[in-house]
Amino acid sequence: MQFSKMHGLGNDFMVVDAVTQNVYFSPELICRLANRHTGVGFDQLLVVEAPYDPELDFHYRIFNADGSEVAQCGNGARCFARFVRIKGLTNKREIKVSTQSGRMTLHVMDNEDVCVNMGEPEFEPQKVPFRAQKVEKTYIIRAMERTVLCGVVSMGNPHCVIQVEDIKTAEVESLGSVLEQHERFPERANIGFMQVVDRNTLHLRVFERGAGETQACGSGACAAVAVGISQGLLDRKVKVNLPGGSLSIEWKGTGNPLYMTGPAVHIYDGTIQL
């Protein structure tokens, strides 16, 4: 099986063309491939499939390193867009794809950065999903024998966003791992820790569902900005600084899609015996 290794701000991916190759990924195989000592090693596996709808270009599937399939990955979407162009699967700069959570439009810019239309943030608790009676800008969750204040939103996948004073000392591993599996998130959640620098800048670390802390999380950056804007902390265009680099996020508010722009890097191509 042929594959490419790519990364978006250090969030790394194994990308496979399932349009021209006949491949099947069991959870066991994915775990084996994800192993950084005995496999390829990655945060997520991205699979390019033929479209189910003639109006679209491709179907985009995402699997975590633990074998679970997820509906969204923003950094992966940027790599997906560059991969299909590098491999000659399309020469379009505007690429329309379906995912488990809906449709996305990916735009490859002249400098090879990719702008992704991530759709409109979803704050309705049942659609996140999150157990709550009604929409709130801030929720209170009990965890680790204390109360945690957070914003909750779906960007095609569930996110919990916590504001912190100092990103360096944020309890990403300890609190993140507890909240990821909290009973109020029936499908688990990605946990973001954001430090607001000013109205156009924030620092962010994310404990990703099924992957732990990663160098960057595109949908997590989108979620943090959506929550920050809804709470009145941020303006509509924000630079998000993650451990692996920076993303530009823009959202004009309710009724509008959110846009994420950032790099996607092709590292190498490989072949592996399955």
Curated annotation (Swiss-Prot):
Places the protein is found: Cytoplasm
Pathway: Amino-acid biosynthesis; L-lysine biosynthesis via DAP pathway; DL-2,6-diaminopimelate from LL-2,6-diaminopimelate: step 1/1
One Pfam family it belongs to: DAP_epimerase
GO molecular function, one term: diaminopimelate epimerase activity
Entry EC no(s): 5.1.1.7
GO cellular component term, pick one: cytosol
Catalytic activity: (2S,6S)-2,6-diaminopimelate = meso-2,6-diaminopimelate
NCBIfam families assigned to the protein according to its UniProt record, in alphabetical order: DapF (TIGR00652)
Subunit comment: Homodimer.
PANTHER family (alphabetical): DIAMINOPIMELATE EPIMERASE, DIAMINOPIMELATE EPIMERASE, CHLOROPLASTIC
Protein name, entry field: Diaminopimelate epimerase
The species this protein was found in: Proteus mirabilis (strain HI4320)
Lineage: Bacteria, Pseudomonadati, Pseudomonadota, Gammaproteobacteria, Enterobacterales
